[in-house]
Amino acid sequence: GILFIFMLFVIVVQSAIIIYSNLFELEHHLGFDASSAYLQAVEIWRCKSLVPSTFALTTTLGLDSPTPLAALFYGITGNIFLGFGIANIILDVVIAVIFYNLLKEFKLSAFEIALGFIFLLCPFMTPDHFIDNNLSYFAMVLGEQGSYSVKIITMLLLLWVVVQLEHRNNKALQAGSENVSHNNIKLYISIVFATLFSMLTAISSGIYVAITILVPCVFY
């Protein structure tokens, strides 16, 4: 209906804002965290090392962020802002793909999925280009330094694996001894990627994984 079409229009506008901001606006957002991430990406490329000796790490290794990917695109483009923007957009697409598959696992309607994407892609930014240290949703997940984009991917992958396992178990119970392995390939692939991303986040952020991933998995 008209409401669904309007929701799709909102999603397109949100996506356009995210893409434009990442490709053309990052140089105007140089808060402490963002500028540190940009500098780290430059040094990663210059030193050809994921942990450059010329950069003093103050919190995490930054491996579970767009920074390593941004370093690659910086080397290709010669522009750290464009390189970081491209890296952010790629990770945003990955987040969207996993989020879509997760919502599909719940058998949601197209309207419900569209509503979910409106919330996911909301480009919330702090007003007036606040640059002291922008910690808005956009800066943390969708653009700028994107500190939590890879962490979000990791958590969405794990949640997707859990939901798939639950649905697989339910199908097995309903089918009795009948073979229900037709979706095993997708499940195994998601388990592999969830494991790899969890390891990456564990190496980079340590205690974050223990609190947000390992403890919930143990309880599960």
Predicted regions and their residues:
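Helix-to-loop transition at the C-terminal end of transmembrane segments
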Residues: Q14-S35, F130-N133
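Juxtamembrane segments of multi-pass membrane glycosylation machinery
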Residues: R46-L50, P68-L91, I95, K107
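Start-transfer (signal-anchor) and selected internal transmembrane alpha helices
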Residues: G1-I19, A110-I113, K186-I191
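Transmembrane-helix motifs of polytopic, lipid-linked glycan transferases
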Residues: L8-V10, I86-G116, C122-M125, L157
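Membrane-interface micro-motifs in multi-pass membrane enzymes
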Residues: L30, L63, I113-E166
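Membrane-proximal lumenal/periplasmic loop motifs of glycosylation machinery
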Residues: L23-F32, W45-P68
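Membrane-interface alpha helices of multi-pass inner-membrane proteins
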Residues: N179, N183-C217
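Membrane-interface transmembrane helices that cradle and orient dolichyl/undecaprenyl
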Residues: M155-I189
